[in-house]
Amino acid sequence: MWGRISWCSIVALLVATAWAAPHEGHDHGGHTSDHHHHLHHGKDDPHPSHEEMDACHLLAPHNADFAFSLYKKLASSPAVEGKNIFFSPVGISMALSLLASGAKGETHSQIFSGLGYSQLKSQQVNEGYEHLIHMLGHNRDAMQLEAGSGVAIREGFKVQEQFLKDAQHYYNSETFSVDFSKPEAAAQEINKFIAKKTNDKITNMVKDLDPSVLMMLINYMYFRGKWDKPFDSTLTHKANFQVDKDTTVQVDMMKRNGRYEIYQDIENHTTVLKVPYKNSTSMMIVLPDDGKMKEVEESICRHHIKNWHDKLFRSSVDLFMPKFSISATSKLDGILKEMGMTDAFDDKADFSGLTKEVKVKVSQVVHQAVLSVDEKGTEAAAATTIEIMPMSLPDTVILNRPFMVLILEDSTKSILFMGKINNPTA
C-alpha cells in the first residue's frame, strides 16, 4: 500500500507602507527557478553524520511541543469543529524558521519564542533544518520523502542577498520572479510550482491573490510510503463509521491480522497502535475510548508519545482501518498571533534581514495538507508476505470512530504530519 501525503504552507508578505513602482537596479539579483539546489552533502549519501543527527535531534523536542500546541489551538477552534484536522508540524516550523531568518529584533524573538527556540541560536536552527531536509530527502524504492521551500518574489522587488543564500543553503529553497500585479497569472505560476513539488496532490492552493503582495514563502513536503505489511484488498468491506452520536457514514474498511506494536493506556483512555511503513517511518494511531476524544486532545503532549513508544509491545492484532483521502486547509494567522507572534503581522514588523527597500509585514499564513490511505500500490499489490502468528486470541482494533494519526520519522525523531480523522468521507 502506498500512503500519499502532501503538505504546503504559504507565508505572504505585504508592504507595510506605500509601495512605489520599482526603479532600475532594485531587483533580487536575477534568481530564477531554472536551477534546482541540492544540499552539499549529496542526497544519495545514505549515512548521515553524527553532526547531522545531533542537529536534527536538537530541534526535535521543540518541534514536538510546537506541534501539540498548534494541534490544540486548531482542535479548539470553532472553524474546525467537527472537521478533519491534518497538518505538517515540521513543515510549518520550517516555514516560520525561514521567515525568522529574515526577521530582526522583537519580530525575530517572537517567532523563535512561539516555535520554542528561545534557547537556540539562529545558526543552530538553520543548520538543524539543513540536516533535517538532507536526512528526509533519501528516496528509496519503498518510500519517497521530499521537503523544501520556494521564494516567489515580485518582479523588481529587492531582497537581501544573504536571505536568499540562506534560504537556498539551509532550506533547500528555489527562488523565482512573479508578477503579483497580475494576480491570476501569479497564482497560476505559484500553483504550478506547488503541484510539481507535491506530485500534483496539491494543485490549486493559491487563489484570490492580493496584487500588492511583494513576496511569498512556500514550504512543501511530499511523502509516499508503502506499508511494511500491506492489506489484502479482497478483505476490504463496507462498514459504518460513527462520526458523532447523530452521524454515521459508510466507509471501505480494510482488514488485516498481523503483529503490531500496541499499548492500551487505561489512565488516558486510549488505545495506541503503530503501523509501520517500510524504512524508518510509521503511522501512530491514537484511538480514544468512546466519548473521550476531547479529553485526550486537551492533554496530549510529546511526553505521551515517548511514554507510548516505551510501552508499546508486539502482539497479534485484528486491525480494521478505513480507506480515506482527506484534505485540510487552514489560515494560521490568528493562531500564530495567539502563540505570541504578533509583530510579524503588524506595521511594526522588522524584516530588515529580508529587505531594506520598504517596510513589510506578513499578510497571511495558509497551510494545506492532503492524506490518502488505502491498501493498493504497485509493489505492494504484487508482494507476498508470510507471518508466523502465535496461537493466542488477537487483540481487535476497529477504527470506526474518530481517531488521531501521527506520521513519525524515527531517525530524525520528527512528527512529519499529524491530525484527527473525524470523518473519513469528508
Give residue spans per PLM region.
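Detector for small/aliphatic-rich hydrophobic stretches
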Residues: W2-F180, T378-A381, I421
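Non-catalytic, conformational "gating/processing" segments within enzyme and secreted inhibitor domains
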Residues: H28, G82, Q119-G291, D310-S392
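Structural recognition of the beta-strand scaffold that forms the well-ordered cores
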Residues: F86, M94-S97, M283-V286, L406, ...
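Hydrophobic/aromatic-rich, well-ordered segments within soluble, folded domains that form packed cores
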Residues: F86-K104, S212-W227, S414
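Extracytoplasmic/secreted cell-surface and envelope-processing proteins
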Residues: T107-I111, M293-V296, A328-S330, I415-F417, ...
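Short Gly/aromatic-enriched secondary-structure transition segments
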Residues: I111-L115, F231-K238, V296-N307
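C-terminal soluble interaction/assembly domains
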Residues: H367-A369, E375-A426
